[in-house]
Amino acid sequence: MDLTQVLPEKLLADVLRRVAPRGLAACRCACKALLGIIDARRLLRTDLLPHSVAGIFINFHSEGLPEFFARPSTGPTISGRFDYLPPHIGDSQYRGKIEDHCNGLLLLEDYFENYYVVNPATRQWNSLPPHPSMSKSGEIDADFTYQEYLIFDPTVSPHYQVLPPALDELDTVMEESEWPPSVCALHVFSSSSGRWEERSFIRDGEAADTIADMRRHFDKHYAVYCRGALYMHCITDFIMRFSLSNDKCQVIKPPIHGELGECPKLHLGQSEKGVYLASICEMSRLLVWVLDESCGQTNWVLKHNSCIPPILDYDRPILGPWVLQDINYEYLKERKDHTDTEDMKYLKEKKLQLNSSKEVLVEEKIEWDSQNDNILHKEDVVDAHGNGYFDILGFHPYKEIVFLDVSMYRGLAYHLKDSKVQDLGYLYPTTSHLAVLNEYFITESFPYTPC
């Protein structure tokens, strides 16, 4: 039934005002009449979308399941357990990692290279069909890192896309071939068609490097979907901008090397003013740049350059306003073959130490106040340089806040505008007490915004 022919436009608009943003996006795609009503009355306004950060999903190298670091909730719980996904072979539980996040959807990969797109807020999920060969020969060069990225904007469409790096047309035998090639041929997955489709992007401007310079680098490189384009952080720190409206790609050079100094790695993210890059140099100096694309030019503007104060007692197991769900510990505790082992007894002791302040914590307010909660004052920091090291977990997408961890023990929220530091809480997984030291590190982290 065509509701636009049955109901008066004003009445239909009143009905549509009660529809959630993602549902409105679906209505826009249903027919031109609904599209006209929604757009003419500005019913789908991005400023009315939820702008909250529900928590941070974290992949720890030593753990089989992602962890979720978040404020405890009295409502439906968002979890990193993903026990509704197909279980690991020989197990009762899904096991894998999070590859990407975009506007409330997660891209997951299990240990058999099966991919899933998941909405943790609704527990809805879809599996992706196998990816076509990334090379014409059907063989994949082991020296390249293949990461796939998610594209989703609920204000535009209920459908998502998955975009891999531009690798399909590379001749990896030709070490001096330019990277990226003049035509980037990709297989892009579209949820509207349910299949991988060939798509070519024409390079606008010069190449960034040669294939010889693009060999494997194990650090995670993130991507950002912003203003209708995907910004992909590539090896050697240049950014590739894929415009989905005109099928063009462009190389964006990183900040000049003089500014980078001894910065070990850059972290790409999205925040209040668009696309950001951040790096921590000399263990505690935080540098942040914002991408300026005005007047048809691209330029990195240095936004912040300041030292983060060392944190006092950063490794003490004391809970804060945010709590790690400790999914790997709960999973291990449920396994019958681990119930009475010495390792399990040891982990239970560690868990008891951490839970000593939990009852008081749950009684506090649930909504995180990004301005006032758990501000660290002078007595909470130390003067000595090097008391723990800092790493970047991601950006708050709507406020100029960088999420950090201190030696993987505590989470912090660092405000760029006034250098205010908030203690979020203890994020060390209980099961990591059993990990070999060189196996314990964070591989990926994603601030999560539900939709």
Enumerate the predicted regions with their spans.
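N-terminal entry/capping and adjacent linker segments that precede and initiate structured domains
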Residues: M1-C451
